[in-house]
UniProtKB/Swiss-Prot annotation:
It is a multi-pass membrane protein. ATP binds at G876, A877, S878, G879, A880, G881, K882, T883. It comes from Candida albicans. Belongs to the ABC transporter superfamily. ABCG family. PDR (TC 3.A.1.205) subfamily. Disulfide bonds: none annotated. This is Opaque-specific ABC transporter CDR3. Its main location: membrane. Residues 140-395, 840-1083 form the ABC transporter domain. It is found in: Membrane. The gene is CDR3. Glycans are attached at N530. The lineage of its organism: Eukaryota, Fungi, Dikarya, Ascomycota, Saccharomycotina. Gene3D superfamilies: P-loop containing nucleotide triphosphate hydrolases.
């Protein structure tokens, strides 16, 4: 196959023919790799797609191997070996295609096309919605539920895609063009059968060669895939492991003979990594925002490579070129063309910024306009269609830019004389298209295509081809390539790879279990076999059961961590979610076994439980089964719910119910009738009965306390009795089985029955986990809608109706042809709106970063300036140092050191107000999602403008900026999240506006303001930047993919290559000055219609596959332009007074506003966020109310018997369980605020870190007080603790004190959460610390074990635990100064010393006066009935609690709250506040649990 005459190394512009027959295209395109090494890797799109190698060969694989060879076993051809420097992915594809064709009966190649007709898509939402708040949340939720039952009601749905039609044959490459919100993503998702969140209307026809969408979903899912814009991967897997997993899941049964699955998978992984330039990252972790790994660009290529391995026939790519430069994006599209030409793949690609070279590779184009398809057809005829309509394509305007400009009224240019003839609205364009001859021809072609699919039975061929790939024992109609057992095996291997990649997690889990076993068992160390150990044996058994059960609680977090990835793999037909669930359960099993054995082995023997082998192994079996039960329960909850917030409340209530009704807190005989049924459906109750029956059965315990005892009382005989349930008069031993029967109503005969019930629950929950994980659909999007505050929604709808009526009734607009967007009035004051006379300049800026032991220079001697009224473009390839330079200039570096260079304003050094004197528009649009646009702008203006400016002036300035940036139509809209809130362009405008309202007196930095935007939005943003400069603003802006038209909006260019300057100067008209400079210095001539940006990147060797012909850094340093720059910098440095004027009073202040003003505004915003986050508030109140009510009515009006007092104590203790959930619920909210603050507001000096922390602490308190108040009334009175105050006549007083201590308890939970998250980067880590600290506190607070029973070593923890003082305060107020009345089973019965003669009161009088207690029959002479307690204070004394210490205990508890607040402030300052020129101290940067990771390379340091 001969090559074209195109120059080597230049991007292929290509000619294609006979696509449907699978013949390859003729041409050359360069590789993906940017290095100068001999091994150049090339980008490809599908498993067997590829490109021409970089060197020139005289013959191709097609001529060498007419029938193809097996490249896995035959290594004779180096061009087919991915480990060879001579590897050519294009030749590999050609060889594989020949191999498939050589035995088509075995390989059965088959591909799909798609035809759609009358396709209409609608969503269940309105085009604008109102924001959910605490006040309207319940009403809105009820309305949404009601609307789900309304059918075919247009009031509650809107069209996303209007009826459309198209035909894409196998081997054709199609581009989908349109602005954000046009429906491009919805169209691709519809074609890919991803219709969650919207509906395909009845009557719509979508045919994949005669196959329906239902058949695709159920039987051929992997043949049609959708690749989203974002990347989701397991961060702890390496690149090689990620791709190998996908390859194993898609390894076909009909692979080349003699090749194992593992060999095949390894080979294709090596091929795609070589193809995509990922070979060097094979053993590198993927990483994410918090775990170091590959770079963002490499992560994008990894996503592409993964889809490549799926081997889908129809691939729907949604803006997959985002973040790639123009040259790299071109190579990606070229690879898709290769795949289509050779293998008959059918890719559809939505691209927002498409170059002309890339566009020329497409066969067909779809143009979308606000849900209407206004053109479908040949990419070469699209421009002519709209030109014939009456529109003009400007000089240097690319065809895709022209096509998308048609959908923008402000940008399309109308041919003179056609002003009243061309369509204006989307509906008019749609009508024009539906009447066009192009559409009529398309409909005829679609009908013919559909008839042919039925006549030639193409459907059967596709199913046969799909079945040929499937492994043995795989269901014929399954979408998956390998069988379920194989899927589970590969998933288990992936799970272990993930565990190995983050080995600290399993090791810390094991270590945590050992530590908790040692702590718990040491508290109850070596219990003696006597009656005094009964309470401790049952309590430690209870706590051990709960620990074994709750050890799986974090699995609910894991369910959400990987859900997006599992759903993605399901859509790729790698495996069903049930396979992942089964695999993870089996993979978790060994770790559970190890943890369970270690914990229970240590606990069992240190506590001195029953020393019999059978008893030990039965204990181990029941404990482990309890762990499995709770694991499956948490997995079921996670599988059933769609978010962690949804799962928290039901899981917490279930935990509370299961632990309360396990049999220890409330024995069976004390359970109330209304809730006794819970015991029968509570597996932990069966487990607990089995455990303590196993412990007490067949044992006789010595008596440790005889009643009566002391001087004058006999030590033997029937007149004394053991003070224990189950004791008999005259007996000094207690039978274990009798104790169980009387105290718990338990019997040893039930232990194996209980084991069977426990296993039944495990099996049942395993089934429910599999069912829900397979059937649950993740949260769905409603489509892109604006969200307003409820009070503004009617006003906005009225405005929209008036505007629509006006547009429908008016005549067609008379366009002048100008592309200028509407501008703000240019009177003098408005021109001065952003005016500044300050000049920012820098010289010889050098920045280094230490990577391992190497000092790497990232920026090397950079010079430049930014003057008012000028827009300076900062350009270069990825990794050139653009963002790094912006961060260095704006003092935002988070690592590394500026080793030399100066940064000045008007010749003077930078002062402490510099950071708030500039605006920095970050690439990421970071905003608080609950704020409105106006609120976000006012917040920035009020805190960042000088304190001398009044609030009214600041607000007035905000309104001017709103008009300047044309944001008036959505100024009252909620920022929201993508899909429900502002769209991409609106978010970018808001990001710019937030910086402008601060009225930066120096300049504005913009980092990639057009990244991810469509070409028209990018053009709009650049026009906006130009407008700002015209108003006097100085601007420095990085830009990645500018078209020739966009470059006209910039005045100067700073061009970087590998951290060095290669040009700094003016663009000139039509970039003439720039072009002349490079051509004068040896560059090839710039073609007349070429994009100067792409040309200059190729000249300096920054584009893939290009090589610079000289060192342009040295060329620049020796040029006259460089000397002119140095002279100008010298002039600026010698003029320190230039336009500086009088210094403002706050010049040297880091913040414009005072601390108290900062604090007030931040607190106000926090209260707004809370009010507009009803899910958090509802969850908090639901937890407080439901748990309290459940607690209160579980222990409803507990009597003052000895068991009743224990019940009241455990009721108080159970309230502590709520603290963990309340604290963990708060953590994600804090993280949201902190991420915004640290990413945008702290670097811009909006407000101080102390104001941030103080506001966080303050904002929680009112809601905690309210939650505590509701909880108090829901619990205190149902339990009946108020009755204990009746005897002392202090019912009201003690009720108020109990409310006070409960309020402090709730406040403590929030301050503990704030302390734990203040120094932890991840919410999960903070949640673990919260759980650990509260668990230890609950062990040592004196309830599970009293102070006197603890080993002396642990007494210090008893005194240091805040819950000790909380328990003491609540129990003294709740139980003190009342009387005890024993239950019948608690009454000790024995005769006096001389029965029939001596009265009981005479016999027991001396004992009662010393030990307390009371007689029920003091006058009796035969059998004395004695209760060992008569006052509740005796019970408190046993617990080391005194009612007189309430004030002391409350005060100490308040000290703990204050300590948490102080520790929050100190730890945040220590670990997260920038110190000096560093964002975080070098020591703390090394602690992975404190700080995020990032990319291993330093493209954006």
């Amino acid at each position: 196959m001969a090559k074209t005459s195109q120059a080597e190394g230049q991007p292929y512009k290509g000619y294609y023919n006979n696509k449907s027959q699978g013949q390859p295209y003729h041409g050359y395109y360069s590789g993906f790799n940017k290095s100068a090494s001999a091994q150049i890797h090339h980008l490809a799109r599908s498993l067997t797609q590829g490109v021409q190698s970089h060197y020139d060969d005289t013959y191709t694989t097609a001529t060498m191997h007419p029938n193809g060879i097996n490249p896995i076993s035959d290594k004779t051809d180096p061009t087919l070996d991915p480990e060879s420097p001579s590897f050519s992915s294009k030749r590999w594809v050609q060889n594989m295609w020949k191999l498939y064709q050589s035995d088509s009966e075995y390989y059965k190649p088959g591909k799909l096309g798609v035809a759609y007709k009358n396709l209409r898509v609608y969503g269940d939402a309105i085009e604008s919605d109102y924001q959910t708040t605490v006040s309207n949340g319940v009403l809105k939720y009820a309305r949404n539920i009601f609307n789900k039952f309304r059918k075919d009601n247009d009031d509650y749905s809107f069209d996303i895609l209007k009826p459309m039609e198209g035909l894409i044959k196998p081997g054709e490459v199609t581009v989908v063009l349109g602005r954000p919100g046009a429906g491009c993503s919805t169209f691709l998702k519809t074609i890919a059968c991803r219709t969650e969140g919207f509906h395909v209307a009845d009557g719509s026809v979508i045919s994949y060669d005669g196959i329906t969408q239902d058949e695709i979903r159920n039987h051929l899912r992997g043949e049609v895939v959708y690749c989203a814009e974002t990347e989701t991967h397991f961060p702890n897997l390496t690149v090689g492991e990620t791709l190998e997993f996908a390859a194993l899941m898609k390894t076909p049964q009909n692979r080349p003979m003699g090749v194992s699955r593992e060999e095949y998978a390894k080979h294709v992984v090596d091929v795609v990594m070589a193809t995509y330039g990922l070979s060097h990252t094979k053993n590198t972790k993927v990483g994410n925002d918090f775990i170091r790994g590959i770079s963002g660009g490499e992560r994008k290529r990894l996503s592409i490579a993964e889809v490549t391995l799926v081997q889908a026939s129809i691939q729907c790519w949604d803006n997959s070129t985002r973040g790639l430069d123009a040259a790299t994006a071109l190579e990606f599209i070229s690879s898709l063309k290769t795949s289509a030409s050779i293998l008959n793949d059918t890719p559809l690609i939505a691209i927002y910024q498409c170059s002309q070279n890339a566009y020329d590779l497409f066969d067909k184009v779809i143009v979308m306009y606000e849900g209407y398809q206004i053109f479908f057809g040949s990419s070469q005829r699209a421009a002519a269609y709209f030109k014939k309509m009456g529109f003009v394509c400007q000089d240097r305007q690319t065809t895709p830019d022209f096509l998308t400009s048609i959908t923008s009224p402000a940008e399309r240019i109308i041919k003179p004389g056609y002003e009243r003839l061309v369509p204006r609205t989307p509906k008019e364009f749609y009508r024009y298209w539906r009447r066009s001859p192009e559409r009529q021809a398309l409909l005829e072609e679609i009908d013919e295509y559909l008839d042919n699919c039925e006549n030639y039975d193409q459907k059967q061929k596709i199913f046969e081809a799909n079945n040929a790939k499937k492994a043995k024992h795989t269901y014929n109609k399954s979408s998956y390539t390998v069988s379920l057992p194989m899927q589970v095996r590969y998933i288990m291997k992936r799970y272990w790879d993930r565990m190995r990649g983050d080995i600290i997690v399993p090791l810390s889990t094991v270590a945590g279990n050992i530590a908790m076993a040692l702590i718990l068992s040491s508290v109850f160390y070596n219990l003696q076999p006597n009656s005094s150990s009964f309470y401790y044996r049952t309590s430690v058994m209870y706590y051990a059961l709960l620990f074994n059960a709750y050890s799986s609680v974090l699995e609910i977090y894991n369910m959400y961590e990987g859900r997006a990835i599992v759903q993605k793999h399901r859509e790729y037909a790698l495996y069903p979610p049930m396979a992942d669930a089964i695999g993870s359960i089996i993979s978790d099993f060994p770790l559970k076994v190890v943890c369970s054995v270690l914990f229970n082995l240590i606990l069992y023997f240190m506590v001195n439980f029953k020393r019999e082998p059978g008893a030990f192994f039965f204990y181990l079996l029941i404990s482990f089964c309890s762990t499995l039960f709770m694991s499956h329960l948490f997995r079921t909850i996670g599988a059933f719910t769609n978010s962690l917030a949804e799962a928290m409340t039901p899981s917490s209530l279930l935990l509370f119910a299961l632990s309360t009704f396990s049999g220890f807190a409330i024995p069976v005989t004390y359970m109330l009738g209304w809730c006794k049924w819970i015991r029968w459906v509570n597996p932990l109750a069966y487990a607990y009965e089995a455990l303590i029956s196993n412990e007490f059965h067949g044992r006789v315990f010595d008596c440790s306390n005889i009643v009566p005892s002391g001087f004058g009382y006999p030590k033997t005989g029937n007149s004394v009795v053991c003070a224990s349930i189950g004791a008999l008069p005259g007996e000094f031993k207690v039978d274990g089985d009798l104790y169980l029967k009387l105290a718990f109503d338990y019997s040893y005969s039930n232990v194996w029955r209980n084991f069977g019930v426990l296993m039944a629950f495990i099996i049942f929950l395993f089934g429910t986990t599999i069912f829900f994980v397979q059937t649950n659909k993740s949260s769905i999007s409603k489509g892109e809608t604006l969200v307003f505050r409820r009070k503004n929604i009617r006003k906005m709808r009225k405005m929209e109706e008036d505007e629509e009526a006006y547009m429908d009734g008016m005549a067609p607009l008379d366009f002048s042809g100008s592309t200028e967007i509407s501008d703000y009035s240019y009177d003098y004051m408005d021109r001065k709106l952003l005016d500044t006379s300050n000049i920012f300049h820098w010289r010889n800026l050098t920045y280094t970063v230490k990577i391992k032991s190497e000092e790497r220079v990232i920026l090397n001697n950079i010079d430049g300036w930014v003057k008012p009224g000028e827009v300076t473009a900062l350009m270069g390839a990825s990794g050139a140092g653009k963002t790094t330079l912006l961060n260095a200039l704006s003092e935002r570096l988070t690592t590394g050191v500026i080793t030399s260079g100066t940064r000045m304003v008007n010749g003077g050094e930078l002062d402490s107000s510099f950071q708030r004197s500039i605006g920095y528009v970050q690439q990421q649009d970071l905003h608080l999602e609950t704020s409105t646009v106006r609120e976000a702008l006012k917040f920035s203006a009020r805190l960042r403008q000088p304190n001398s400016v009044s609030i009214a002036e600041k607000d007035s300035y905000v309104e001017k900026i709103i008009d300047l940036l044309e944001m008036r139509t959505y100024v009252d809209a909620i920022v929201g999240v993508p899909g429900e809130g502002l769209n991409v362009e609106q978010r970018k405008r808001l990001t710019i506006a937030v910086e402008l309202v601060a009225r930066p007196k120096l300049l504005v930095f913009l980092d990639e303001p057009t990244s991810g935007l469509d070409s028209q939005t990018a053009w709009s943003i650049c026009k906006l930047i130009r407008k700002l400069a015209n108003h006097g603003q100085a601007i420095l802006c990085t830009i990645h993919q500018p078209s020739a038209i966009l470059l006209e909006e910039f005045d100067r260019l700073l061009l970087l290559q590998k951290g060095e300057t290669v040009y700094f100067g003016e663009f000139g008209a039509n970039c003439h000055t720039l072009i002349e400079y490079f051509e004068r210095n040896g560059a090839s001539k710039c073609p007349q219609h070429a994009n100067p940006a792409e040309w200059m990147l190729g000249v300096i060797g920054a584009a893939p596959g290009t090589q610079a012909n000289q060192d342009y850094f040295e060329t620049w340093r020796n040029s006259p332009e460089y000397r002119a720059v140095q002279n100008e910098l010298h002039r600026l440095e010698e003029m320190p007074g230039l336009a500086s004027g009088e210094k403002e009073p706050d010049t040297n202040q880091a913040y414009a506003a005072s601390f108290w003003k900062q604090y007030i505004f931040v607190v106000h915003r926090l209260f707004q966020q809370y009010w507009r986050t009803p899910s958090y508030i509802y969850s908090k109140f639901a937890m407080a109310v439901l748990c309290s009510l459940f607690n209160g009515f579980t222990y409803y009006k507990s009597q003052n018997s000895m068991q009743g007092l224990k019940n009241q104590m455990l009721s108080i203790f159970s309230m502590f369980v709520v603290l963990t959930t309340l604290a963990q619920q708060y953590v994600p909210l804090f993280v949201t605020q902190r991420d915004l603050y640290e990413a945008r507001e702290r670097p811009s000096k909006t407000f101080s870190w102390l104001a941030f922390i103080a506001a966080q602490i303050t904002a929680e308190i009112p809601y905690q007080v309210l939650a505590a108040t509701i909880s108090f009334f829901s619990w205190y009175y149902p339990v009946g603790l108020y009755r204990n105050a009746v005897y002392s006549g202090a019912v009201t007083h003690r009720g108020v004190l109990m409310w006070l201590i409960m309020t402090l308890m709730f406040i403590y939970s929030s301050t503990l959460a704030q302390f734990c998250i203040s120094w932890n980067q991840l919410a999960d880590y903070a949640a673990n610390w919260i759980s650990l600290l509260l668990t230890i506190s609950m062990i040592f607070c004196g309830v599970i074990a009293t102070k006197d029973s603890m080993p002396k070593f642990w007494v210090f923890l008893y005194r240091c635990t805040p819950l000790t003082y909380l328990t003491s305060a609540m129990m003294s107020i709740g139980l003190g100064d009342s009387f005890v009345k024993c239950a019948p089973t608690e009454i000790l019965t024995f005769p006096p010393q001389t029965p029939g003669v001596q009265k009981c009161q005479d016999y027991m009088g001396a004992y009662i006066s010393i030990a307390g207690g009371y007689l029920l029959n003091p006058e009796a002479t035969d059998n004395c009935k004695f209760c060992i307690m008569d006052k509740t204070n005796q019970f408190l004394d046993f617990m080391n609690i005194s009612i007189h210490n309430f004030g002391r205990d409350t005060g100490i508890f308040i000290v703990f709250i204050v300590f948490n607040m102080a520790a929050t402030v100190f730890s945040y300052w220590l670990f997260r506040v920038p110190k000096g020129n560093r964002e975080k101290g070098s020591f703390f940067d090394k602690l992975p649990f404190l700080n995020g990771g990032g990319d291993t390379n330093h493209e954006n340091v």
